[in-house]
């Protein structure tokens, strides 16, 4: 899978470099540079065809639209991954806190119910085990 991405990256780098050179030729166009311009245009077409071939190999890859928004805003797309991981970590900590609170509540509830309803709690503990989770 990595070689597919490497192949695409290589073709994209070549394409961008060709476009850069094409821009230089066009910005200072002289009739004598027509042959070079035609050659660069043909390279551009070939580059697009190569990229299209790579696209067909990567058709099953899904990229979140937010990544493209980051790129459009001039931001590093790796920041998207970092921020997603940070949000997941924060949510994980929040859920862990809720679980810990509910576990403590269950333990306290079992303890208090044992004081009020000792016979019923003895049956409960016989079915579910003597040690409530703490």
Swiss-Prot record:
Instruction: Determine the domain of life of the protein's source.
Output: Eukaryota
Task: Indicate where this protein resides in the cell.
Answer: Nucleus
- Nucleus as a keyword of this entry, yes or no, is yes
What keywords does the record list, in alphabetical order? Activator, Developmental protein, Nucleus, Transcription, Transcription regulation, Wnt signaling pathway
A single GO molecular function term of this UniProt record: transcription coregulator activity
Q: Which GO terms describe its cellular component?
A: mediator complex
Entry keyword Iron: no
InterPro entries assigned to the protein according to its UniProt record, in alphabetical order: Mediator_Med10 (IPR019145)
An example of a Gene Ontology BP annotation on this entry?
A: atrioventricular canal development
Q: What function does the entry list? A: Component of the Mediator complex, a coactivator involved in the regulated transcription of nearly all RNA polymerase II-dependent genes. Mediator functions as a bridge to convey information from gene-specific regulatory proteins to the basal RNA polymerase II transcription machinery. Mediator is recruited to promoters by direct interactions with regulatory proteins and serves as a scaffold for the assembly of a functional preinitiation complex with RNA polymerase II and the general transcription factors.
Subunit record text: Component of the Mediator complex.
Which PANTHER family does the record cross-reference, listed alphabetically? MEDIATOR OF RNA POLYMERASE II TRANSCRIPTION SUBUNIT 10
What does the sequence similarity comment in the record state about its family?
Answer: Belongs to the Mediator complex subunit 10 family.
Which protein are we looking at? Mediator of RNA polymerase II transcription subunit 10
According to its UniProt entry, this protein's organism is Danio rerio
This protein's gene is called med10
């Amino acid at each position: 899978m990595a070689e597919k991405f490497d192949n695409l990256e290589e073709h994209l780098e070549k394409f961008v470099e060709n476009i850069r050179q094409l821009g230089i030729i066009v910005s200072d166009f002289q009739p004598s540079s027509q042959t070079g311009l035609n050659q660069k245009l043909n390279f551009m077409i070939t580059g697009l065809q190569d990229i299209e071939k790579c696209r067909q190999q990567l058709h099953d890859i899904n990229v979140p639209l937010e990544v493209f928004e980051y790129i459009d805003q001039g931001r590093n797309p790796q920041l998207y991954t970092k921020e997603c991981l940070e949000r997941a970590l924060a949510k994980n900590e929040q859920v862990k806190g809720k679980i810990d609170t509910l576990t403590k509540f269950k333990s306290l509830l079992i303890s208090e119910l044992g004081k009020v309803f000792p016979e019923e709690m003895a049956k409960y503990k016989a079915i579910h085990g003597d040690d409530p989770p703490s």
